[in-house]
Amino acid sequence: MSNPATKIEILYPEYGNQGGDNGNALYLEACLPKENFVYTSHATTPYFVENTPSAIIMGGMTEAQQELIISRLMPYKDRLAELADQGVPMLFAGNASELFGEKIVNPDGSEIEALGLFKFTTTRYMPQRFHDVQVGEFDPGNGKEPFVVVGFKMQFTLTEGDNSNCYFLKNKVGFGINKESKLEGFRRKNAIATWLIG
């Protein structure tokens, strides 16, 4: 039996479904009753603004939707940082992760200010696309044994930033945040930004 106090917030499910990345939410929905989920759409104030959710999840989207969601979340970026520092689990997968860096650079050199939860810059290289299979080790850092995570990456972007002390995975197979890196994603306590999908 589930605890009705458990509230998992799915941010912008109408957008966060690129590459089937809404599968993270669908899996949780198959495991827990509907009462455990809160869905924030573009027309509503996020649940996390006035409440502390049990977890926050968002999947990948189009570039135009990225910019729309940044504008929607910008007034609440300090609250997101506060929740991350409190240890609230968050998973931003695929290009949803890019919303939480410092900026996104377009192919024409123009820049989009991002939410700043993590210290990285993302550069868009459209129409060039980067694909990769990922096999990496995740260390929960809580005294439990590290375990292997397998996934796939499909993106128009590469990222610059120092994640040597805050990475999500140490890859055995596949590139990390860019082609020179083996360290995938960023982590701030239990908040994870990763380009992995699937």
Language-model regions, residue ranges each:
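RNA-binding accessory domains that recognize and position tRNA/RNA substrates
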Residues: 1-5, 10, 123-128, 136, ...
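A glycine-centered loop/beta-turn motif at secondary-structure junctions
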Residues: 178-198
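Glycine-rich beta-alpha junction loops
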Residues: 12-14, 156-158, 198
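N-terminal beta1-alpha1 cap of cysteine-dependent amidohydrolase-like domains
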Residues: 1-85
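Pocket-forming structural segment of enzyme catalytic cores
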Residues: 107-185
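Cysteine-nucleophile active-site neighborhood
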Residues: 62-140
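Short coil/turn connectors at secondary-structure junctions
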Residues: 3, 52-53, 86-88, 110-113, ...
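Structural motif
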Residues: 55-59, 91, 193-195
